[in-house]
Amino acid sequence: IFGAILPLALGALKNLIK
């Protein structure tokens, strides 16, 4: 489960940083 949430959270963070 975490394996799927990790990339999702990373993508959201990258979007915020961008």
From Swiss-Prot:
Expressed by the skin glands. It is found in: Secreted. GO terms for biological process: defense response to bacterium; defense response to fungus; killing of cells of another organism. The modification Lysine amide is found at residue 18. Its main location: secreted. Keywords: Amidation, Amphibian defense peptide, Antibiotic, Antimicrobial, Cytolysis, Fungicide, Hemolysis, Secreted. GO terms for cellular component: extracellular region. Has antibacterial activity against the Gram-positive bacteria S.aureus ATCC 25926 (MIC=8 uM), E.faecalis ATCC 29212 (MIC=16 uM), and B.subtilis ATCC 19659 (MIC=8 uM). Has a less potent antibacterial activity against the Gram-negative bacteria E.coli ATCC 25922 (MIC=32 uM), and P.aeruginosa ATCC 27853 (MIC=64 uM). Has antifungal activity against C.albicans ATCC 90028 (MIC=16.7 uM), C.krusei ATCC 6258 (MIC=16.7 uM), C.parapsilosis ATCC 22019 (MIC=67 uM), and C.neoformans ATCC 90012 (MIC=33.5 uM). Has hemolytic activity against human erythrocytes (HC50=18 uM). This is Hylin-a1. It comes from Boana albopunctata (Spotted tree frog).
